[in-house]
């Protein structure tokens, strides 16, 4: 099983997503498995790809989990990328890396990669966009830094990408702004006409400090 594999290899594992029957409804979920083989959580896709996923029920909770001594991760699935509030909810809960497993071979992969970069910039975090390659999908997985730069990118074939990330950089970018300028999370928090979500999940945003010009 995936849990046995994660324990054997001493890795945290998210083996993509699959359909899952829960509480009388069919959902699309991605399991998060720790390096001890424990099932940490099941992330439910919020936005089914309608009308193609007709009959699939979307989830109503954002998925954030902490890997001890590493950092805070957010997870959303495939079509969730197309809805900015999905990634914003993850960032507001402190996600420093957002993981995005998908399986698509559609002609809009170019646009998805644009949105992935925009998401990294808007949420000031690392964004790991993983798409199935080979016979199942068109691949082109991409890893993006918290200022929108492409760190590494796969081809259309099945491929393994390895990268080391500095999560302290997320903290610096969120504190000082992208290139020392835009501070969207703090601006979102301090807006006098906030969205409802700003009131619901304000605790993490308050840890970012005052919205001010960074000192040299």
Named regions from a protein language model:
Residues 10, 18-21:
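Glycine-rich, aromatic-flanked loop segments that form ligand/cofactor-binding clefts
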Residues 64, 126, 132-216:
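C-terminal beta-strand edge segments of enzyme domains
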Residues 8, 59, 93, 213-216:
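Eukaryotic scaffold repeat domains enriched in small/polar residues
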Residues 1-14, 81-161:
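CN hydrolase (nitrilase-like) catalytic-core segments centered on the catalytic cysteine
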Residues 14-15, 41:
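A structural signal for short, well-ordered beta-strand segments and their strand-loop junctions
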Residues 4, 20-96, 106-114, 118, ...:
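Active-site catalytic loop in hydrolytic enzyme cores
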Residues 7, 35-38, 45, 121, ...:
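Generic secondary-structure signature for well-ordered alpha-helical cores
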């Amino acid at each position: 099983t995936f849990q046995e594999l994660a324990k054997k290899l001493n890795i945290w594992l998210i083996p993509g997503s699959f359909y899952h029957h829960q509480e009388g409804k069919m959902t699309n979920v991605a399991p998060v498995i720790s390096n001890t083989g424990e099932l940490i959580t099941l992330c439910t896709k919020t936005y089914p790809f309608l009308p193609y996923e007709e009959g699939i029920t979307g989830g109503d909770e954002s998925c954030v989990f902490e890997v001890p001594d590493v950092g805070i991760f957010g997870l959303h699935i495939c079509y969730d990328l197309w809805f900015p509030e999905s990634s914003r909810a993850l960032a507001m809960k402190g996600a420093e890396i957002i993981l995005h497993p998908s399986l698509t071979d559609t002609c809009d992969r170019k646009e998805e990669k644009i949105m992935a970069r925009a998401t990294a910039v808007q949420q000031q975090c690392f964004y790991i966009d993983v798409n199935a390659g080979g016979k199942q999908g068109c691949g082109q997985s991409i890893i993006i830094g918290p200022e929108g730069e492409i760190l590494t990118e796969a081809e259309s074939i099945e491929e393994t990408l390895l990268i080391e990330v500095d999560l302290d950089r997320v903290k610096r970018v969120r504190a000082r702004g992208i290139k020392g300028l835009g501070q969207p999370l703090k601006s979102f928090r301090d807006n006098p006409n906030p969205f409802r979500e700003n009131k619901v999940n304000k605790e993490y945003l308050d840890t970012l400090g005052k919205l001010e010009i960074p000192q040299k």
